[in-house]
Amino acid sequence: AEMLAFQALVRDAASRDARRFLLAGKVEDMLNTVVRQIAFHNFETKFHEARRSGELSSEDMSDIWMETQTAALGPAIRLDDDYRPVWAYIPHFVHTPFYVYAYAFGDCLVNALWQSYQTRAEDDRQMFVNDYRGLLMAGGTKRYDEALAPFGLDATKSSFWHLGLDMIADMIAELEEL
């Protein structure tokens, strides 16, 4: 529903600048959700692996943090020493370990569902809406593979993830054209 509302806002934007503003905000949000949360997950994985060999100091944790964040952000972003302790400010690592992947999964899922809706024939869209309502009504009663089956989506296949990531790439391309 959020993507439907967003697409309507973009479609009905009063000007190019308004459209650019909306797209830029959405792209930034999606990149933060997907790239940042995956980097957080990589940090958690590495520090738990390192912890198997013994206790880690805050310096060890900061080294792992900088390694994973630098790898995720690439050479365009330079992280200084002030960024080293940032891991300690993120409550997920303590209160809900290994939860952050859900943000990236959720964002890619929304994008994949939207792409699935967009590629359907007009007369098939009502079936999608019915399936989507069924997904929402099921709540957490179904495994993700069962819940996504009516949409022809399989989160174990790379094509699922590409649907979500390609949508981000498409928005970036649209933004660059503006």
Regions found by a protein language model. Name each.
Residues 4-17, 33, 37, 41, ...:
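C-terminal, non-catalytic "cap/extension" segments appended to globular domains
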Residues 1:
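Structural signature of FAD isoalloxazine-binding scaffolds in flavoprotein oxidoreductases
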